[in-house]
């Protein structure tokens, strides 16, 4: 019983830490980590996101190091950034939180890098309101991987979001149904130095800050239309 209570307390503390205020330096580190994740995944020769999905993407979210706790209640949480395609390139990024839970025993904690790709205009639409739940408010599917994945068509009919994970060097599509995605308004305000409307930022009405230029350039490079990777 004591071990159970101790584990539960640790889980709550870890989850609370994910919601703690971040410094601008922390946010800069998060953006740089997101770019590193994107670079490492997209520079793989074959085991990567198919070209037709890259070309069709409307928004891209990267969550470096999402945690699945090694506790009785398998809480999952992570923080990341999102940018969306606009009429003149890709938007400045906003900060998001992801949280979910899988009931049951967990053995060992895991840290997993996630990439979310919206493949139509509805993919991240609910995020503009405040938050949404994957699989409920936005239909989602584990994304196809590799050049052969271009032949897969099921996702075109059934999904607004495609989700990918990398764990211990292995990259694959992953189901994230039940995971909540919400605006991190505090971190976004800290990064920009003033409150920002997610709708305004993601529609390209806010300039890309110097600290986010390299991340946005990386997204623009990898998710470029009509370009061989």
Residue spans for each PLM region:
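Small-residue-enriched, tightly packed secondary-structure blocks
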Residues: 21-229
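Basic side chains
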Residues: 2-3, 30
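Sec-dependent N-terminal signal peptides
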Residues: 4-14
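Eukaryotic low-complexity, non-globular regulatory regions
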Residues: 3-5, 228-229
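Sec/Tat signal peptide C-region and signal peptidase I cleavage site
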Residues: 15-21
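Generic cytosolic/nucleocytoplasmic N-terminal low-complexity/intrinsically disordered segments
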Residues: 1-2, 38
């Amino acid at each position: 019983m004591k071990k159970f209570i101790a584990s539960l307390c640790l889980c709550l503390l870890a989850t609370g830490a994910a919601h703690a205020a971040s410094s601008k330096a922390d946010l800069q580190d998060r953006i740089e980590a997101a770019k590193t994740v994107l670079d490492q995944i997209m520079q793989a020769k074959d085991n990567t996101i198919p070209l037709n999905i890259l070309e069709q993407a409307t928004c891209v979210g990267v969550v470096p190091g999402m945690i699945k706790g090694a506790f009785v209640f398998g809480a999952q949480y992570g923080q990341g950034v999102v940018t969306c395609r606009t009429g003149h390139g890709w938007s400045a990024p906003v900060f998001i939180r992801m949280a979910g839970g899988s009931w049951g025993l967990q053995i060992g904690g895991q840290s997993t890098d996630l990439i979310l790709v919206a493949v139509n205009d509805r993919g991240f639409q609910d995020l503009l309101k405040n938050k949404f739940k994957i699989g409920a408010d936005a239909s989602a599917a584990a994304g196809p991987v590799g050049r052969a994945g271009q032949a897969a068509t099921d996702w075109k009919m059934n999904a607004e979001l495609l989700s990918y994970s990398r764990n211990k060097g292995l990259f694959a599509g992953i189901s994230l149904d039940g995971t909540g995605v919400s605006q991190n308004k505090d971190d976004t305000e800290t990064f920009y130095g003033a409150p920002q409307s997610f709708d305004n930022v993601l529609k390209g009405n806010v300039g890309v800050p110097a600290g986010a230029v390299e991340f946005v350039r990386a997204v623009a490079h990898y998710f470029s239309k009509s370009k061989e990777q």
